[in-house]
């Protein structure tokens, strides 16, 4: 078994132990792709996987607006209120951190394992909610940047 396959098996086990279905399913899918000799899909998944994931995430977020569970009036109130304004600022900061996290993962793809382990620890011990490695990478990039200020 190659190191990539072994890493996927370890991630599968971590996902199962931590009851993180996303990690377990992703590791399983990648193992199936590898073992079924459909590894020609890897470049496509690597290139477009993030876009597809964000597409489905955005679709799920916009459903309440599309189904009128959140009205235009609600949207206008939330944009003009202090919590709404702070949400906008939070969105700006989060997207910037995500961008930095994406750069970090492109520069050093091996960091993903640490991000997943950290996410699992957060789930198990801090009742955290996994939303994906991109934000974790953004926070890690911020920490690395702060550390670089002192070196």
UniProtKB/Swiss-Prot annotation:
Origin superkingdom: Bacteria
- What is the protein name for this chain? UPF0756 membrane protein Dred_1676
Q: How does it sit in the membrane?
A: Multi-pass membrane protein
Pfam hit, one = DUF441
Family the entry assigns: Belongs to the UPF0756 family.
Localization of this protein = Cell membrane
Keywords linked to the UniProt accession: Cell membrane, Membrane, Transmembrane, Transmembrane helix
An annotated GO cellular component of this protein is: plasma membrane
Q: Which InterPro entries match?
A: UPF0756_TM
* TM helices/strands, residue ranges: 9-29, 47-67, 75-95, 111-131
């Amino acid at each position: 078994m190659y190191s990539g396959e072994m890493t996927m098996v370890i991630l599968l086990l971590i996902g199962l132990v931590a009851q993180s279905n996303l990690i377990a399913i992703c590791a399983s899918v990648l193992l199936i792709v590898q073992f079924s000799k459909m590894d020609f899909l890897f470049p496509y998944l690597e290139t477009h996987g993030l876009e597809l994931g964000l597409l489905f995430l955005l679709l799920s977020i916009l459903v309440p607006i599309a189904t009128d569970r959140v009205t235009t009036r609600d949207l206008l109130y939330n944009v003009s209120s202090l919590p709404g304004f702070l949400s906008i600022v939070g969105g700006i900061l989060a997207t910037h951190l995500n961008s930095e996290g994406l750069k970090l993962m492109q520069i050093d793809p091996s960091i993903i394992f640490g991000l997943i382990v950290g996410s699992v620890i957060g789930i198990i011990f801090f009742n955290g909610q996994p939303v994906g490695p991109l934000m974790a990478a953004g926070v890690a990039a911020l920490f690395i940047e702060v550390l670089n200020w002192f070196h």
